[in-house]
Amino acid sequence: RWDVDQCIYYCLNGVVGYSYTECQTMCT
């Protein structure tokens, strides 16, 4: 299973313009 914290980390660093909340929503 994809680790949520790791997903958020990669989302924040890899997806331009995404906020923490948006990454959290996408990753959970």
From Swiss-Prot:
Expressed by the venom duct. It comes from the Eukaryota. GO terms for cellular component: extracellular region. Its main location: secreted. Keywords: Disulfide bond, Neurotoxin, Secreted, Toxin. Disulfide bonds join 7-27, 11-23. The keyword Disulfide bond applies. It is found in: Secreted. The keyword Signal does not apply. Signal peptide: none annotated. GO terms for molecular function: toxin activity. The cysteine framework is XIV (C-C-C-C). Belongs to the conotoxin L superfamily. In vivo, intracranial injection elicits scratching and grooming activity in mice, and causes body and rear limb extension and tail curling immediately upon injection. This is Conotoxin as14b.
